[in-house]
Amino acid sequence: MKKKIFNTLWVVGVLTFAGFCLPACHRELDVQQSYDFALQTMPVQKEIKKGETAEIRCSLKRAGNFADTRYTLRYFQPEGKGTLKMDDGLVFKPNDRYPLTREEFRLYYTSQSVDRQTIDVYIEDNFGKVQQQTFAFNNKKVEWFNQSLL
């Protein structure tokens, strides 16, 4: 009789243990696909004159690496007038998205204005995460003087 009670308790114990373990398992793996990222840049000049080009060295720093993550770049210029291009020569149009295929790249901003200029650069991944960085340039004053007065 004791053996039958022991066997019954053992079976109930095993079934209880299985009851706790089985709900924790499911067939689908929980794979993280979207990771945080940041756009880092080297210091950029603060003054620019019309026709001058400023180099912006950029680096995309990712918290993780998912193979199917794609990044795009776009920019908007709320102040001033100028052009922005990639180091491979591609000239960007404001608010158009361009695929970003490298983590290290350079942007070149060429001033076409004598006013204060601001550009907002946006990097977005295919999961909807966005990083924005603003670059502001003041007009570089050109000193004109008459050398005959010296």
Regions found by a protein language model. Name each.
Residues 2-7, 17-42:
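Bacterial Sec-dependent N-terminal signal peptides
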Residues 2, 33-150:
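First exposed extracellular module after export/assembly in secreted or surface-exposed proteins
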